[in-house]
């Protein structure tokens, strides 16, 4: 299985990079995991609705440029589908079983994802209504993907 995580902006904080590196190492035996960063658009405070849409559209174009036709795309969004870890694990396993071996997760920037990215997504995922920095969301997503693999092999990691 190939897993790609596309995120807007660079991870500058060492503690986030270290955490992600740890999960990349742990997942190495289950999947080839690749992190792809796309440039974020500079967004000053107090943007109009039109300016926000423009920022999301520009970031969205960069994201879409990193997605291949065959990839199964899961967009992370507050309004996405919430599910327990066990259900998420089964969905990941089922995707592989049904021939979707290239899974791409997309994490938007501070303003979220463009309508074009949401339209391209085959599914959505939400970790709840909480607002989190998109940098932290990368680490949380990595942990949940790792947890899914652990659930699927019956590991005691998930208790």
Curated annotation (Swiss-Prot):
Specifically methylates the pseudouridine at position 1915 (m3Psi1915) in 23S rRNA. Homodimer. It catalyses: pseudouridine(1915) in 23S rRNA + S-adenosyl-L-methionine = N(3)-methylpseudouridine(1915) in 23S rRNA + S-adenosyl-L-homocysteine + H(+). The keyword Membrane does not apply. The gene is rlmH. Belongs to the RNA methyltransferase RlmH family. GO terms for molecular function: rRNA (pseudouridine-N3-)-methyltransferase activity. Keywords: Cytoplasm, Methyltransferase, rRNA processing, S-adenosyl-L-methionine, Transferase. It comes from the Bacteria. S-adenosyl-L-methionine binds at residues 76, 108, 127-132. It is an enzyme of class 2 (transferase). It holds the Pfam family SPOUT_MTase. This is Ribosomal RNA large subunit methyltransferase H. Its EC number is 2.1.1.177.
């Amino acid at each position: 299985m190939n897993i790609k995580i596309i995120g807007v902006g660079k991870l500058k904080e060492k503690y986030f990079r270290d955490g992600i590196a740890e999960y990349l190492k742990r997942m190495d035996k289950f999947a080839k995991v690749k992190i792809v960063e796309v440039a974020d658009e500079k967004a000053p405070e107090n943007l109009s609705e039109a300016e926000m849409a423009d920022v999301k559209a520009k970031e969205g174009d960069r994201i879409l440029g990193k997605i291949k036709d065959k990839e199964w795309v899961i967009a992370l969004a507050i309004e996405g589908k919430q599910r327990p870890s066990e259900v998420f694990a089964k969905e990941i396993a089922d995707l592989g079983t049904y021939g979707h071996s290239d899974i791409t997760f997309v994490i938007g920037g501070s303003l979220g994802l463009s309508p074009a990215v949401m339209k391209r997504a085959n599914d959505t995922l939400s970790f709840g209504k909480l607002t989190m920095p998109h940098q932290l969301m990368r680490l949380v997503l990595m942990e949940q993907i790792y947890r899914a693999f652990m659930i699927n092999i019956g590991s005691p990691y998930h208790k």
